[in-house]
């Protein structure tokens, strides 16, 4: 039985305003995505579109469009950069599902369950190739540098997570380094390229990157909590997947650090040795409840969310700025 964490749900916790402001540009991004997934190798569009059309929020490409708008950009390079960001994200999901042996993604069977691990990995590689082609076509070496560096950092973060898997001695700082790489870096890059292609001052580029980095950390911390305290129907994946896969996330780090000897022995048995019995997930949630690790993880997410909002202070009041502030609130209050 999962514990439902009482998230704040303010009326401003919505991405609707952002969706409305970037709707016309997102139509162009989606058309670009559809075009660039085309291939004479029929399995490629089948696998790619299975995931791309499965109902994701498209938050990362919308952030690219939003930051370009906030920076007053008047060209069309942001369209291909936003599509590149979405392809990078989709590729990481295809690869992650293979590494994690995931059965579900966004409430549907994962691509690896339908086409196999090999196809998932190779189509992910195809999407990365298409992403880099579009970056080059935009003609901004700085934007290319930001996104290509992000691709390397994401891979480093994934390897760091792999190395930390099943290691209950992982510290909070070590875990935060993992999520900065594997999750927050793409948020940061997606936000930074907008003012870069608009040739805005370095201070604005840095501020936009800070918005993305802090939002990405907050987003992942909430995700970690939802794996133990969410609802499967909304999440589109099974509750407790992280636990069953031996993933060390912040709620686990805190529970292990605060636990007594017998509690630590439970975590070592379940996560390091993979010896999980019926009822162990409920016991894990019970320990997290005892030590308030889910609530404290959410508290940390709010800290990073506040820093994301603070980074927006550099920009004058506008509908786009307000919409971005609402996106931060949404990421903190979300249930999926």
Question: What are the residue ranges of the model-derived segments?
Answer:
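All-alpha prenyltransferase/terpene-synthase fold signal
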Residues: 1-336
């Amino acid at each position: 039985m999962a514990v439902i964490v009482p998230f704040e749900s303010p009326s401003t916790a919505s991405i609707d305003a952002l969706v409305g402001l970037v709707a016309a540009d997102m139509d162009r991004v989606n058309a670009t995505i559809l075009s660039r997934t085309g291939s004479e190798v029929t399995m490629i569009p089948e696998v790619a579109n299975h995931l791309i059309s499965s109902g994701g929020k498209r938050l990362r490409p919308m952030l690219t469009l939003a930051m370009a708008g906030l920076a007053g950009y008047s060209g069309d390079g942001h369209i291909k950069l936003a599509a590149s960001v979405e392809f990078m994200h989709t590729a990481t999901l295809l690869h992650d599902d293979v590494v994690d042996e995931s059965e579900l993604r966004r409430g549907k069977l994962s691509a690896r369950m339908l086409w196999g691990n090999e196809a998932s990995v190779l189509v992910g590689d195809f999407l990365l190739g298409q992403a880099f082609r579009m970056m080059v076509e935009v003609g901004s070496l700085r934007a290319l540098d930001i996104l290509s560096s992000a691709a390397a950092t994401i891979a480093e973060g994934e390897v760091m997570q792999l190395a930390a898997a099943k290691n209950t001695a992982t510290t909070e700082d070590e875990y935060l380094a993992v999520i900065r790489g594997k999750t927050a870096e793409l948020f940061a890059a997606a936000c930074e390229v907008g003012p870069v292609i608009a040739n805005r001052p370095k201070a604005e580029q840095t501020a936009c990157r800070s918005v993305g980095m802090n939002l990405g950390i907050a987003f992942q911390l909430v995700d970690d909590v939802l794996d133990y305290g969410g609802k499967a129907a909304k999440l589109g994946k099974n509750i407790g997947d992280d636990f069953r896969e031996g993933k060390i996330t912040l709620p686990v780090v805190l529970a292990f650090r605060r636990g007594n000897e017998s509690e630590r022995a439970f975590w070592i048995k379940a996560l390091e040795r993979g010896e999980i019995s019926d009822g162990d997930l409920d016991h894990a949630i019970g320990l997290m409840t005892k030590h308030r690790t889910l609530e404290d993880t959410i508290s940390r997410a709010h800290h990073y969310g506040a820093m994301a909002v603070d980074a927006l202070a550099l920009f004058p009041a506008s509908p786009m700025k307000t919409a971005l502030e609402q996106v931060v609130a949404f990421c903190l209050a979300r249930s999926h």
